[in-house]
């Protein structure tokens, strides 16, 4: 009976001599260790998966990886992880000396202090400002983005109803009507769309009741004589050049966005989405496969010659296009390489007098896309991932190519109504979505650890 008592007393003496290891026969520091630093847990934070880590270890992991996932099992956590109060109090009571030493080391490490501050700021942005506002935030349906989607849904319904009601008028456009069947009013409409200068001759054409058949027979000499009396040689040349295009096509060539969409629904949808997601590849495609009809007017609009900067309107300037000069190519290539979305914004700016609101939507969207692209480059630079740029470029090229081929294969099967919905969504709704993306990037930049 005496020997067991002695062994028990010896065990208690050993525990008093080594208080950092255990306070009982079966509890040691190793059982409360963090799987990141392999030291005792300080402010233990338990994730949704059940794993616990030191809060500063979790903050360092988040700052370096920018991922909201468990460092051990890689399961994503939901919400913002909090300190396990029960586990923290138990560890502090069992191992007070060890916790005190760890706290002193942590407070002396500036990197850890900054990471904890950034991590907490990130958490404050994720949770409601006050407990009483939790239910109100849920009723708001997710905040700003939910409100945006609600507004977009209402606007989408209005636009789709408008498109449905005006569907017949789209087929009555002059781009679908043979020239020989034009009335005198339609001839005047065609003339006025050449530019503001053409309104000078409106009454002369109306008084003579020039219809489509008569228009096809007019020559340059007749335009210069009574009753038309077009004395300005550049005006006569512009009218004759456009008349030659009308004779060659048999219909009026498209001169604005809606006429272009009516004649080329597939190409307009392709250009809208391609220039939005991959402007550099899209412009390269236009240069290789659609040089005369699309690329040449585009480069002359965004990089005009100095002698072209006269009072002529945009339609008149695009009637007779020559090969770009080296100066135009230099200006284009610089913008193409560094600011591709600026090219789209400049093109839309030149069409403001024709498409007042639509051009403004395009300009705003181009600016937002430029900012988002800048954020992408900043992330690559800050994470030292420049070596991955070639791989990213190849992946992007492969993704865009496969998507384009997929759409081209199934294009005949896609209803026109669906194409119109996609077109209006990308044209008017995408800028509002990009505003929300820019706001999120700015918030993320605030919490980024430098």
From Swiss-Prot:
Side Cytoplasmic, residues: 1-140, 353-360, 426-450
Topology versus the membrane: Multi-pass membrane protein
GO-annotated cellular components: endoplasmic reticulum; endoplasmic reticulum membrane; membrane; plasma membrane
Protein name in the entry: Bifunctional apoptosis regulator
Tissue spec: Expressed highly in brain, moderately in small intestine, weakly in testes and only faintly in liver and skeletal muscle. Not expressed in heart, kidney, lung and spleen.
Main location: endoplasmic reticulum
Signal peptide as annotated in the record: none
Pfam families named in the record: SAM_1 (PF00536), zf-C3HC4_4 (PF15227)
Entry keywords, A to Z: Apoptosis, Endoplasmic reticulum, Glycoprotein, Membrane, Metal-binding, Transferase, Transmembrane, Transmembrane helix, Ubl conjugation, Zinc, Zinc-finger
Gene: BFAR
Residue ranges, Lumenal side: 162-331, 382-404
Positions bearing carbohydrate: 232
A molecular function (GO) term: ubiquitin protein ligase activity
PROSITE patterns: SAM_DOMAIN, ZF_RING_1, ZF_RING_2
């Amino acid at each position: 009976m005496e020997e067991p008592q002695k062994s028990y007393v010896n065990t208690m003496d050993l525990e008093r001599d080594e208080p950092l290891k255990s306070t009982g026969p079966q509890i040691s520091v190793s059982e409360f260790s963090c799987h990141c630093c392999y030291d005792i847990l300080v402010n233990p934070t338990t994730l949704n998966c059940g794993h616990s880590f030191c809060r500063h270890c979790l903050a360092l992991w988040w700052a370096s990886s920018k991922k909201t996932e468990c460092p051990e099992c890689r399961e994503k956590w939901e919400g913002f992880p909090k300190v396990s109060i029960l586990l923290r109090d138990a560890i502090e009571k069992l191992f007070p000396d060890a916790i005190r030493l760890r706290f002193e080391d942590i407070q002396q490490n500036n990197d850890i202090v900054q990471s904890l501050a950034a991590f907490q700021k990130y958490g404050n942005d994720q949770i409601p400002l006050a407990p009483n506002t939790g239910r109100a935030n849920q009723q708001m349906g997710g905040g700003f983005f939910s409100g945006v989607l609600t507004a977009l849904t209402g606007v989408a319904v209005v636009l789709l109803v408008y498109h449905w009601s005006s569907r017949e008028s789209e087929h009555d456009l002059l781009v679908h009507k043979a020239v020989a069947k034009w009335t005198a009013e339609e001839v005047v409409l065609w003339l006025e769309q050449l530019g503001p200068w053409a309104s000078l001759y409106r009454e002369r054409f109306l008084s003579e009741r020039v219809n489509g058949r008569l228009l096809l027979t007019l020559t340059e000499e007749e335009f210069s004589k009574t009753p038309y009396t077009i004395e300005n040689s550049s005006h006569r040349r512009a009218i004759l050049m456009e008349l030659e295009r009308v004779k060659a096509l048999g219909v009026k060539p498209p001169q604005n966005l809606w006429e272009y969409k009516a004649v080329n629904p597939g190409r307009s949808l392709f250009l809208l989405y391609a220039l939005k997601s991959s402007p550099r590849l899209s412009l390269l495609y236009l240069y290789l496969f659609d040089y005369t009809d699309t690329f040449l007017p585009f480069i002359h609009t965004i990089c005009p010659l100095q002698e072209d900067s006269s009072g002529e309107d945009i339609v008149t300037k695009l009637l007779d296009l020559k090969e770009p000069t080296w100066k135009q190519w230099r200006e284009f290539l610089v913008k193409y390489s560094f600011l591709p979305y600026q090219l789209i914004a400049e093109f839309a700016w030149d069409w403001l007098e024709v498409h007042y609101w639509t051009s403004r939507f395009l300009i705003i969207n181009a600016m937002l896309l430029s900012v988002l692209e800048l954020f992408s480059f900043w992330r690559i630079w800050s994470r030292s991932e420049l070596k991955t740029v070639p791989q990213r470029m190849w992946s992007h090229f492969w993704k865009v190519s496969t998507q384009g081929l997929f759409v081209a294969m199934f294009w005949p099967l896609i209803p026109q109504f669906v194409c119109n919905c996609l077109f209006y969504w990308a044209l008017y709704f995408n800028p509002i979505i990009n505003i929300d993306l820019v706001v999120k990037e700015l918030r993320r930049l605030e919490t980024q650890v430098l």
